[in-house]
Amino acid sequence: MAGSSYGNIFRVTTWGESHGKGLGVVVDGVPAGLELCEEDIQIFLNRRKPGQSKFTTPRKEDDAVEILSGVFEGKTTGTPVSMVVWNKNQKSKDYSEIASYYRPGHADFCFDEKYGFRDYRGGGRSSGRETIGRVAAGAIAVKMLSGLGIKFLTYTRSIGPVTINEVNFDAHEIYNNSLYMPDADAVLKASEYLEECLKSLNSSGGVCECVITGLPVGLGDPVFEKIDANLAKAIMSIGAVKGFEIGDGFDAAKATGLTNNDAFIMRAAAVSKETNHSGGTLGGMTDGSPLIFRAAIKPTPSIAATQHTVNKSGEDIEISIKGRHDPIIVPRAVVVVEAMAAITIADALLMNMGARMDRITDFYKKL
């Protein structure tokens, strides 16, 4: 199976299955000398691990990370950083029944058709647990970028019909609730909505939003390495994501050139923008403004409500999916979205180091 690697210089390869022995990641291109320990990674993994609220899967996993290589005496060595998280709470028998049919909204049918064989236990590589490796790699990227003043603020913007009110926006509220919403009123309304979903044996989707600040001008390369194009690829590669937009996104299609253009102004002796409809990118490069994007996440496809499908013999059947599943995955996806964004920015930053001859010359003059 191809397609398990992402990035050019800061390159991430994930491996493992939901019900295998473990899941992990190899991160190549990490600069030497970055202070790094398992706790730096664990903080991020704790944000996505299951069983933290009634709105997430009851599967209990510590998701404790082990760094296997690439770190010595608390610092990265410049060699590949390899990490693993061992699975400890698999209940594969919960999935034995689904080996004979195709779950609506899942990759079962496509895996069977493409490979002629699939790991039906929790979805194998198409499981949400695959994102463990992404989050571990993203933690390294965030640590690296934070030292350069680049910060990430990622949160749940909406759940089902409930959207945060910008007037009530409070960044401190994000980590005070299990839904990762920056609006206390929206948390209450979203919780009530999710309770109704649970009662009806159903699930919900939502939207994650990410704001990246401290970016220099010029990250990203025309034409096929545009920063917004690479972010779209990174975010859309997350299994549950069905939509991506940056800045005003699809609303830009309703605007006029005059209302959509961001006027340039001088501010503190530097070129700046009066507005940020573009979401922090121009011509596929960062423009120094906050980079703002959103990811639309579909409802969890594994639901206990009765659904119609077919089995491998081609017979029409009715199913009710058993097992331990999230009624909503948006809150746990927040850190995954942040991780993929950080990986993309880290890769673009390293690629940008060779963009100008004077920077290369200055570097070698210091040697």
Region spans (language model):
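Alpha-helical support elements that line or immediately flank enzyme active sites
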Residues: 21-33, 128-150, 225, 229-233, ...
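A short glycine/serine-rich beta->alpha loop
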Residues: 11-14, 119-130, 217-221, 276-281, ...
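Internal helix-turn-beta structural module
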Residues: 11, 302-367
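Glycine-rich anion/phosphate-binding loop at the beta-strand->alpha-helix junction
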Residues: 15-21, 201-204, 208-316
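N-terminal, positively charged regions that mediate nucleic acid binding
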Residues: 1-59
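Glycine-rich, N-terminal phosphate-binding loop and its surrounding beta-alpha-beta segment
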Residues: 44-104, 108
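Glycine-rich, mobile lid/loop segments that gate access to catalytic sites or pores
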Residues: 113-223
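Short acidic, glycine/tyrosine-flanked loop/strand segments centered on an H-E-D-like triad
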Residues: 99-124, 307-327
